[in-house]
Amino acid sequence: MTLYDENNLHIIKDNLRYLKLLSKQYPSISSASSEIINLQAILNLPKGTEHFISDVHGEYESFTHMLKNASGVIKRKIDDVFGTSLRECDKKNLATLIYYPEQKLDLIKKSEKNLEDWYKITLYRLIRLCQIVSSKYTRSKVRKSLPSDFAYIIEELLNEQGDRVDKQEYYNSIIETIIDIDRASEFIIAISNVIQRLVVDKLHIIGDIYDRGPGAEIIIEALSKHHSIDIQWGNHDIVWMGAAAGCEACIANVIRISLRYANLSTLEDGYGINLLPLATFAMDFYKEDNCENFKPRTIDKNLNETDIKLLSKMHKAISIIQFKLEGKIIKRRPEFKMEERLLLDKINIKEGTLSLNEKIYKLIDTNFPTLDKENPYELNERERDLVEKLTNSFINSEKLQRHIKFLYSNGSLYLKYNSNLLYHGCIPLNEDGSLKEVTLCKETLKGKSLLDKLDRLAREAYFFKKDPESKLYGMDMMWYLWCGSNSPLFGKKKMTTFERYFLDDKNTHKEEKNPYYKYRNDEKMCTMIFEEFELDADNSHIINGHIPVKTKEGENPIKANGKLLVIDGGFCKAYQPQTGIAGYTLIYNSYGLLLTSHEPFSSIHKAIVEGNDILSSTTILEHVSSRKRVLDTDSGEEIKKQIHDLEMLLVAYRKGLIKEENEANIRF
């Protein structure tokens, strides 16, 4: 530790106004000195554990379990603490109890013959485990994580050693009293939640909370209660954010995807979006149309034929509306350079064909009852009325708006954190691997400046309610971020939604990826990106999601000699046959980086009843010889700045530039 040079009085005088404000918080040499000592001590603690998860896609059961077991961290802690002193079945039961304390206790109360003994043994084990997971934090930080009902008792137990002879009776009496007064269950629930909280210091979600899974709103509700979280928006998140902002094209996309996968629970049950007007509209216009190409993909869903027919009609109806709304944006924003996606005017209804890239293709569906061949991108009166009703539903959904505000306040397009660069999709590149220049708002941008600009525009889409022009541009940009050719979230040249519905030729379905994906294994590309984002290439990593890792085909999630890590979570069941696993998560603790691959999760019910955990295997990517400390982190840098400021305050006190408060005044 280097103390502030007292001879630099001119710097202190320049900062005197700020130091006087700081003196309100630390009104004496004694209080400022104590805080410096505390902060300096914190710098020497081990860094907290970071947990990285990506591409959840609404699969709330798998995600909930992953959050509770911290990608196997809790199980490893149990192994570290109890080793061979516990049977494997006991370790498994202890882990399940920590993950799901309320539900597991209900089962144990029904099956355990000597509940009092079980309570005593379990309490000792949980306290011992909690002592270990809390040991890397200050008492103050641990105290803040404790539930108010048991804060004093847990703190006492954590800071006492049960094997110390002089305190053994005191320690044992606390545990016995907890059992005697019938508070053991509540205490077990409380301390299990504390263990869950302390085992991970920071949670990073690298995009795509939303998509086809049935419980995105459940996931966000859980995340909003997390003690420390950041989110890097994914393309599926941004389209929902655009929908909540009132972007009609985004609303149509969100509904279309939900119908495509027969997942209406998030829309209807989660957010109270009224889809009855869409159902009525679809039945009126597509009554005689079987909408064969719009049948929902019903993975793990048992739908009757009537439901499938209705969903298919709704699916087709909103798809046509989507293409019309997107056409309006493309025409309104020539700088997006997406004219090739204007396809409705290329349809020859009489011939049943589509003109695409100077070729004529036969349409496999030629029923377009709402299409005006003279003005194909104009909504008819019924469509306009429907879109207005749907938009009102999205804008006035209290829960949706609350969740989207959470995504804005805790999220961004990218994040630099502890020398790592986190983003969901890609950094747009040219074919030669150089950063691609994109013109937006008459500015030519690339790399970091491009992402910074897009981040600001995404916020304007939602928050610029009093500036209609800026808000409209922002909303159009939200749609562009969803499917635009230079979108860092989409990462492809075009989205071939229309072709997949209406053309048989598979070649027209192809979506060419940005050259970024070709260069992901190139260390030079990673170094270029690190330099662009002002990171040290020797000590940094890119942590990326979006594209599932095809482990089944031998693909490795570790790219560019460990500089780039792809952790698409693989939660989405539709991708698991392609990937062969349920994806990857990443743990970054004081010892280094651990990449964990996961097998598919069965269910929360089986986890509770049978103790089934997600089968995982862990690869140590990097192991440091000496543990990383808070000193080596971004938080450490902030603490060092605080220490520097407090040292200046000490000098100001000692030189008489600021007067200390009277000790009596401080006390009373």
Swiss-Prot record:
Its EC number is 3.1.3.11. It is an enzyme of class 3 (hydrolase). It catalyses: beta-D-fructose 1,6-bisphosphate + H2O = beta-D-fructose 6-phosphate + phosphate. Pathway: Carbohydrate biosynthesis; gluconeogenesis. One of its GO terms (molecular function) is fructose 1,6-bisphosphate 1-phosphatase activity. Coiled coil: none annotated. It holds the Pfam family FBPase_2. GO terms for biological process: gluconeogenesis. Its cofactor is Mn(2+). It comes from the Bacteria. Belongs to the FBPase class 3 family. This is Fructose-1,6-bisphosphatase class 3. It comes from Clostridium botulinum (strain Langeland / NCTC 10281 / Type F). The lineage of its organism: Bacteria, Bacillati, Bacillota, Clostridia, Eubacteriales.
